[in-house]
Amino acid sequence: MASIKFTTKDIFEQDFKIGFRGYDQDEVNDFLDDIMKDYDAYEAIIKELKGEIARLKAQAANSPKTTLPTEESNDVLRTERPSSATNFDILRRLNRLEKEVFGKQIVQDQE
């Protein structure tokens, strides 16, 4: 996990050297104030998320365990799928055969 290099206090107490044609000191201070506000917001978010993680871990520890499908039940599911597909194929073939057989009988009966 990455470590935090600066705190809001570090940013607040940072001094910059003023050189010839240096940066506007008020502009730098305003920018650093915004950064400090962001750091405070990030710290609050982190604290809130850590609390939520702890709450969810406790909830997970206290909740009943759900069982995951075992290899045996997976095998049963795998064997059921081909049979249902086979049943569908059989019904489709039977339907075609009935149309073929009964269709010819209807034509013969009409003659």
UniProtKB/Swiss-Prot annotation:
GO terms for cellular component: cytoplasm. Residues 32-63 form a coiled coil. It holds the Pfam family DivIVA. It is found in: Cytoplasm. Residues 60-71 have a biased composition (Polar residues). Residues 59-80 are annotated as: Disordered. One of its GO terms (biological process) is regulation of cell shape. HAMAP family: GpsB. Divisome component that associates with the complex late in its assembly, after the Z-ring is formed, and is dependent on DivIC and PBP2B for its recruitment to the divisome. Together with EzrA, is a key component of the system that regulates PBP1 localization during cell cycle progression. Its main role could be the removal of PBP1 from the cell pole after pole maturation is completed. Also contributes to the recruitment of PBP1 to the division complex. Not essential for septum formation. Belongs to the GpsB family. This is Cell cycle protein GpsB. It comes from Streptococcus suis (strain 05ZYH33). The gene is gpsB.
